[in-house]
Amino acid sequence: MSLLNLNYFEIFGIEAEIIIDIEHLNSKYLTLQSEFHPDKFVNASNLEKSMATRVSTYINDAYNTLSDLVERVDYILQINN
């Protein structure tokens, strides 16, 4: 399954809750970026480079949203709408 099909909480393997384990979020973020960062795909096809960029951007957006309490609460409201 593509990460792009997961909600932000699912990407990091955490429950959609207001209080989250920030250390786990940080650790998982670094792991995901080490796997999907576009720099890892320098010798890949243009399609693979494009997909890596999309996935990396999605991971960044997810991380930035979940690391901020106000944005996290807003996101929880969005996905439970």
Language-model region placement:
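Short, surface-exposed loop/turn segments at secondary-structure junctions
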Residues: 42-50
